[in-house]
Amino acid sequence: MSRRHKAEKREINPDPKFGDLVVTKFMNAIMLDGKKSVAENIVYGAFDAVQGKSKQEPLSVFHSALDNIAPHVEVRSRRVGGATYQVPVDVRPERRQALAIRWLIAAARKRNETTMIDRLSGELLDASNNRGSAVKKREDTHKMADANRAFSHYRW
């Protein structure tokens, strides 16, 4: 880690359809090999599919899904006198959002539907209803932190 300069945060533009920065971050995370237009088609197609399946506003479904996936606490490894403890720590808001996006995409990629649009829309709907493997990942993270609450005094 550099001691001289802190890396500057890059300015990102909101997406053209909804004007939302979180959707842009989501698109950038979906994108593979710099193919932004493909990522846009996937995200907007999934949003259209969500609207078709649930008759709800896709942006509100997306934000509620992210809120249901985002972890509040996680465990970090801390070495104390030859033993490594899993210490529960609170998650910063930026990291909460990043983890939620990452877990949502990973869960969507693991699903069995044929196209990524179907997988993503299904996972978004499941997550907004507190179901699905991304929400399970959040629950597992919280259980791990709860099980290691005894080591919370090793926080830094």
UniProtKB/Swiss-Prot annotation:
<keyword id="KW-0687">Ribonucleoprotein</keyword>
<dbReference type="GO" id="GO:0015935">
    <property type="term" value="C:small ribosomal subunit"/>
</dbReference>
<dbReference type="InterPro" id="IPR020606">
    <property type="entry name" value="Ribosomal_uS7_CS"/>
</dbReference>
<dbReference type="GO" id="GO:0003735">
    <property type="term" value="F:structural constituent of ribosome"/>
</dbReference>
<comment type="subunit">
    <text>Part of the 30S ribosomal subunit. Contacts proteins S9 and S11.</text>
</comment>
<keyword id="KW-0699">rRNA-binding</keyword>
<dbReference type="GO" id="GO:0019843">
    <property type="term" value="F:rRNA binding"/>
</dbReference>
<dbReference type="GO" id="GO:0006412">
    <property type="term" value="P:translation"/>
</dbReference>
<keyword id="KW-0689">Ribosomal protein</keyword>
<keyword id="KW-0694">RNA-binding</keyword>
<comment type="function">
    <text>One of the primary rRNA binding proteins, it binds directly to 16S rRNA where it nucleates assembly of the head domain of the 30S subunit. Is located at the subunit interface close to the decoding center, probably blocks exit of the E-site tRNA.</text>
</comment>
<dbReference type="InterPro" id="IPR000235">
    <property type="entry name" value="Ribosomal_uS7"/>
</dbReference>
<dbReference type="InterPro" id="IPR023798">
    <property type="entry name" value="Ribosomal_uS7_dom"/>
</dbReference>
<dbReference type="InterPro" id="IPR005717">
    <property type="entry name" value="Ribosomal_uS7_bac/org-type"/>
</dbReference>
<keyword id="KW-0820">tRNA-binding</keyword>
<dbReference type="InterPro" id="IPR036823">
    <property type="entry name" value="Ribosomal_uS7_dom_sf"/>
</dbReference>
<dbReference type="GO" id="GO:0000049">
    <property type="term" value="F:tRNA binding"/>
</dbReference>
<dbReference type="Pfam" id="PF00177">
    <property type="entry name" value="Ribosomal_S7"/>
</dbReference>
<comment type="similarity">
    <text>Belongs to the universal ribosomal protein uS7 family.</text>
</comment>
<protein>
    <recommendedName>
        <fullName>Small ribosomal subunit protein uS7</fullName>
    </recommendedName>
</protein>
